[in-house]
Amino acid sequence: MKKKAIFGGTFNPIHNAHLNIAAKSIEKLQLDELIFVPSGNPPHKSEKGIAPAELRYEMVKEAIKDNCKFRIDDYEIKKKGISYTYETLEHFSRSQKDVDWFFIAGLDSLMDLDKWRNVNTILSLCKFIVFNRSGYNKSQVLEQKEYLEKKYINNIVFLDIKPIDISSTIIRQKIRENEYIGDLVPEKIYDIIKKNKLYV
């Protein structure tokens, strides 16, 4: 059985920390493939400040094209209406049989998971892989994991990846303040951002 992971997000923009997490996930989980799924209309974020979906898709496609185990899918971008994680997982599990599915998420997602739709469906369809993110208290995180595992299916796994302290929010702020971001994103992504005057 093949092992594949879904890495969803707005990728607004994709940056070096995203790529590091993806590469480390493949290595540590011994994945056959990792699929980047840029969101169309995410339920937990307003549209203000989010670059057009086609440009976010283009940036992810450019950033991952040199890694043969990375793939991009436009399912959420093409889907009309709000994108919910459980629907995305149902789509992939239906369209690709005999796959052991993983879903890559940050600690922020773990802390908010109880607010997501159909959590039991999500945890029944995949192993919910959580990577480190700065700014969270360890005991608080473990307490949340224990609470979720009692309430839902026990399918949450921590992945020990040393976090790179980069966020899309910081990058957008630096762009607005006319600061250099070339060390935070791949060169090709920096070029797309400049060419399309994104986040100014």
UniProtKB/Swiss-Prot annotation:
Reaction equation(s) it catalyzes: nicotinate beta-D-ribonucleotide + ATP + H(+) = deamido-NAD(+) + diphosphate
GO MF annotation: an example: nicotinate-nucleotide adenylyltransferase activity
EC number: 2.7.7.18
InterPro entries: Cyt_trans-like, NadD/NMNAT, Rossmann-like_a/b/a_fold
Top-tier EC class: transferase
Pathway of action: Cofactor biosynthesis; NAD(+) biosynthesis; deamido-NAD(+) from nicotinate D-ribonucleotide: step 1/1
Disulfide bonds: none
Superkingdom of this protein's organism: Bacteria
Positions of transmembrane segments: none
Keywords: ATP-binding, NAD, Nucleotide-binding, Nucleotidyltransferase, Pyridine nucleotide biosynthesis, Transferase
Function as written in the Swiss-Prot or TrEMBL entry: Catalyzes the reversible adenylation of nicotinate mononucleotide (NaMN) to nicotinic acid adenine dinucleotide (NaAD).
NCBIfam families listed in its UniProt record: cyt_tran_rel, nicotinate (nicotinamide) nucleotide adenylyltransferase, PRK00071.1-3
Family as reported in the entry's similarity comment: Belongs to the NadD family.
The protein's name in its UniProt record: Probable nicotinate-nucleotide adenylyltransferase
Source organism of the structure: Clostridium acetobutylicum (strain ATCC 824 / DSM 792 / JCM 1419 / IAM 19013 / LMG 5710 / NBRC 13948 / NRRL B-527 / VKM B-1787 / 2291 / W)
